[in-house]
Amino acid sequence: MGWAAEAIHRDGIQHRSKRRDLLEILIPYGLVLGVIWTPRPIQKWLWILAAAVVVLVTAISWPGLDAMGLRRKNFLRSLWIVGAAMAAATVAVALAGHLHTLYLHGGPLWLLENYWLYAIWSGAQQFLLQSFFLLRFMRVLPRKWMAALASAGLFSLAHMPSYILVPAALVWGFLACLLFLRYRNLYPLAMAHAILGITIAITIPGAVDHNMRVGLGYLHYSPRYHWHHPLWMRRSPQP
């Protein structure tokens, strides 16, 4: 009985109805899509509502820090994920430099000043993907890989209609979910997400990926409007 209780605590699996889990998936995700596809100023209030619902549902259904991957265990073992992201970023930056598409005007300090907000947003996205949606899909679907694929599918659809970010989000989302299931540590995945996202931002021209915007922001993107904004707003990925 002890090992069973430990497994339940680790995986965040509880005896509860699938209907409740589906509602906890569909309602927050519907609000996320509302934020993405709603114009301002309504978007601001929907964003607040969506964040509040996620926090409330997480608090009510609290699975524990270990289940959500907010722990020290396996952190060092999974740091290779960050190294792999850095290696991929190095190759992408070198290729962008060769193709003259690199948008990099400084060193680490410049990156920190321009992309610190996106780094935080990357962690929030990984929390939603793994600690929120994946845990619930694991209780709804019979196989873990199915839960990983379903979570990645939602993550990818939230990046519509960007033809660059949709496939990138699907691939990264699926791999990240599988890695989360293996190591159950969110921190390296959040760091890798930030690295890969910033790499896309500085290697692909804003006119091509619409400044990494999604939803209504992607459709309303204007290069002329883009260049009248400060540097950090022009090329920072947009939450």
Predicted ranges, named:
Residues 1-65, 201-239:
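N-terminal, membrane-interfacial amphipathic/helix-forming hydrophobic leader that caps
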Residues 34-39, 93-104:
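Juxtamembrane "helix-exit" motif on the non-cytosolic side of transmembrane helices
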Residues 81, 150-151, 191-192:
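Hydrophobic core positions of alpha-helical segments in small-molecule transporters
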Residues 5-28, 48, 62-91, 106-114, ...:
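Interfacial transmembrane-helix boundary/kink motif in multi-pass membrane proteins
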Residues 41-49, 113, 142-151, 185-188:
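Membrane-interface starts of transmembrane alpha-helices
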Residues 103-157, 161:
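Function-critical hydrophobic alpha-helical transmembrane segments in multi-pass membrane proteins
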Residues 45-53, 111-116, 120, 124, ...:
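Membrane-embedded alpha-helical segments of multi-pass membrane proteins
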Residues 166-226, 230:
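Functionally important transmembrane alpha-helices
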